[in-house]
């Protein structure tokens, strides 16, 4: 946010907070467009890239249609929207929630902890001031998208998602695009050529997809997580006891959505977690996830043994009333599984998993998240918070991959999924971790089998352990593979993984690596229309439309910068070569020359054939006339 602000030197953060102008600039040659649905307030945002014309041989040009791409940046890249992080984003879903008439406004926060924070006057300079009263389902009600889907209701959120997944293309346009796309191999996925609102409803009703959208986060643009839709990417942000501030985390949020984060997890473990989260949610156009056990641990001064159900329950309500869209809950770490990790090379590497394992051993009791799971479901369905069932026993190195502890927990997560579904609570399953390439497919197969096709959400996996500083590369390989096999969402890894807290540039690097992985998975699955952007890039590359190449890229800034390092002049962006091969050895220029030469030969051949045909016809006419002049006789005396 334009530099770190010392909160001790200002009266209120709500008077000074601002977002970096770089984070709100539209992408080059791009504009925000909105596709309208069946009602005027269903306006689906996406990005449209303007392409330059193709120069033809005769000096004329041929227009190239603009390219639409999926956009997660929300209003931040729309110049028509005034951005003020002190007030938060427009509450786009509020009317839809009102129309359902199944919620009530509370008079204020009901969490004991939230109330205590509100009464603490020393926090006034940190508060997000423009708060709204939280909502909750009417007594005994259920407001989850899964509940509506199972009742046969197509919600505005579902319609929005169908338009968004299709990039507002008509069915005929997608069918036409599929003629220039490889069919792919989808390993049992069932994506139709054209996604309808009814298909979205069916997938949600079956539990194969989730729409994370807490009723207290109406600022979020509806999105879907499921293997029959585009593969999604999550970015982690959050402060720690060592570094970062509220304004830095909001800046990281905006930056992450700019570079393609479909969801963002706030993993804050430092000071002022409650206030930080409020600022993040109010300014987030994407769903926000958390790991509630982190904050619960802070409430008991970091002593895992002192955790209890009452503290955790209050934390769930606190975060649900703020608008958190999905909770990672490590309810599958059972007491009997903990000894299975003793022989591992790296033991338990999940923070949440280790916290619950320590609690279980200290009390010699079953995990209270497991024993109170149905009570957790009651809380979740009153706000439409989705489960992200945490893999607390995931492998922390490739030596521990696919072991007894990991798959025992996975089977328990499958059991918990069915309990959650009984309550109509949306559920996704978290996965590893560190897995070598030849063992990745087994993870996907086991998850589909035991978790009844609930969406899978994995951290990578990293396919080797020797890449510190480059873990976004090694995990991106695993992410692309498991996305192809059917994983619905990939949790990004940054270059700082295992090394430190990521900064803005690390967030971008991790996201670009994972957008590549997700897109590669879509291509490999043959997702309808996935190859449109690749084909547009290839055409621009062959025609030496350099500006279009930069603008179509996932990271236009870096593409342009790398080109300009060696060919900085504007005239070089019209050149039919780059610095890799130079003007004489450019394969595409040579190919164009070959094409031109072939076209010339064909023209000459056609001309020659035309001339020969003309001579033959003239000869035929002469012989015909000679026949007529001779009295039309077949034979003549010699």
UniProtKB/Swiss-Prot annotation:
E.C. number(s) listed in UniProt: 4.1.99.17
List of residues binding substrate: 236, 265, 294, 330, 350-352, 391-394, 430, 457
Region (Disordered): 608-633
Cofactor note: Binds 1 [4Fe-4S] cluster per subunit. The cluster is coordinated with 3 cysteines and an exchangeable S-adenosyl-L-methionine.
GO biological process, one term: thiamine diphosphate biosynthetic process
Keyword set, alphabetical order: 4Fe-4S, Iron, Iron-sulfur, Lyase, Metal-binding, S-adenosyl-L-methionine, Thiamine biosynthesis, Zinc
Pfam families documented for this protein: ThiC-associated, ThiC_Rad_SAM
Molecular functions per Gene Ontology: 4 iron, 4 sulfur cluster binding; carbon-carbon lyase activity; zinc ion binding
Residue stretches in coiled coil: none
Cofactor: [4Fe-4S] cluster
Domain of life: Bacteria
Physiological role: Catalyzes the synthesis of the hydroxymethylpyrimidine phosphate (HMP-P) moiety of thiamine from aminoimidazole ribotide (AIR) in a radical S-adenosyl-L-methionine (SAM)-dependent reaction.
PANTHER family assigned: PHOSPHOMETHYLPYRIMIDINE SYNTHASE, CHLOROPLASTIC (PTHR30557:SF1), THIAMINE BIOSYNTHESIS PROTEIN THIC (PTHR30557)
Name recorded for this polypeptide: Phosphomethylpyrimidine synthase
Species annotation: Hahella chejuensis (strain KCTC 2396)
């Amino acid at each position: 946010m334009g530099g770190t602000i010392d909160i001790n030197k200002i009266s209120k953060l709500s008077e000074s907070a601002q977002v970096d102008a770089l984070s709100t600039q539209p992408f080059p040659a791009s504009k925000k467009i909105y596709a309208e649905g069946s009602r005027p307030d269903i306006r689906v945002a996406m990005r449209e890239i303007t392409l330059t014309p193709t120069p033809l041989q005769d000096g004329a040009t041929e227009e190239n249609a603009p390219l639409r791409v999926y956009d997660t940046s929300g209003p931040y890249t729309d110049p028509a929207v005034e951005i003020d992080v002190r007030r938060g984003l427009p509450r786009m879903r509020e009317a839809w929630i009102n129309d359902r008439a199944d919620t009530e406004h509370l008079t204020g926060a009901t969490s004991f902890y939230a109330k205590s924070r509100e009464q603490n006057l020393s926090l006034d300079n940190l508060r997000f001031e423009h708060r709204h009263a939280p909502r909750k389902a009417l007594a005994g009600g259920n407001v989850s998208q899964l509940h509506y889907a199972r009742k046969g209701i197509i919600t505005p959120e579902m319609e929005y998602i169908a338009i968004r997944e299709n990039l507002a293309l008509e069915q005929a346009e997608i069918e036409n695009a599929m003629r220039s796309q490889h069919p792919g191999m989808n390993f049992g996925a069932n994506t139709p050529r054209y996604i309808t609102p009814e298909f979205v409803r069916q997938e949600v009703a079956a539990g194969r997809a989730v729409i994370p959208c807490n009723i207290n986060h109406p600022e979020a643009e509806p999105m879907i997580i499921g293997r029959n839709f585009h593969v999604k990417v999550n970015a982690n942000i959050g402060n720690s006891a060592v570094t970062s501030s509220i304004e830095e985390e909001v800046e990281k949020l905006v930056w992450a959505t700019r570079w393609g984060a479909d969801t963002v997890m706030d993993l804050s473990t430092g000071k002022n977690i409650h206030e930080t989260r409020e600022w993040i949610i109010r300014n987030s156009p994407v769903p926000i996830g958390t790991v509630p056990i982190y904050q619960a641990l802070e409430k008991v001064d970091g002593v895992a043994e002192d955790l209890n159900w009452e503290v955790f329950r209050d934390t769930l309500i606190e975060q649900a009333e703020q608008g958190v869209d999905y909770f990672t809950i490590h309810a599958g770490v059972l007491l009997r599984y903990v000894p299975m990790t003793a022989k591992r090379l790296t033991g338990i590497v999940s923070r949440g998993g280790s916290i619950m394992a320590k609690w279980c051993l200290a009390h010699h009791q079953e995990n209270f998240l497991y024993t109170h799971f149905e009570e957790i479901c009651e809380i979740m369905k009153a706000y439409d918070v989705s489960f992200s069932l945490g893999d607390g026993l995931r492998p922390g190195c490739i030596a521990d991959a696919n072991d007894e502890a990991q798959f025992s927990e996975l089977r328990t997560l499958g059991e918990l999924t069915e309990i959650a579904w009984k309550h109509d609570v949306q559920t996704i399953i978290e996965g590893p971790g560190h897995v070598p390439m030849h063992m990745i497919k087994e993870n996907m197969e086991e998850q589909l089998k035991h978790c009844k096709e609930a969406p899978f959400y994995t951290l990578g996996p990293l396919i080797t352990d020797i890449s510190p500083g480059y873990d976004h590369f090694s995990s991106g390989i695993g992410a692309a593979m498991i996305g192809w096999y059917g994983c619905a969402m990939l949790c990004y890894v940054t270059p700082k993984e295992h090394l430190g807290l990521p900064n803005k540039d690390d967030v971008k690097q991790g996201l670009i690596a994972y957008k590549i992985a997700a897109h590669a998975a879509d291509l490999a699955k043959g997702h309808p229309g996935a190859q449109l952007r690749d084909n547009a890039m290839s055409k621009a590359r062959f025609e030496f439309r350099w500006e279009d190449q930069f603008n179509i890229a996932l990271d236009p800034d870096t593409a342009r910068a790398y080109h300009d390092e060696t060919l900085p002049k504007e005239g070089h962006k019209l050149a039919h070569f780059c610095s890799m091969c130079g003007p004489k050895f450019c394969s595409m220029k040579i190919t164009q020359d070959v094409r031109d030469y072939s076209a010339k030969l064909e023209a000459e051949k056609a001309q020659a054939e035309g001339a020969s045909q003309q001579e033959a016809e003239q000869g035929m006419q002469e012989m015909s006339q000679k026949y007529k002049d001779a009295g039309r006789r077949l034979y003549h005396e010699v």
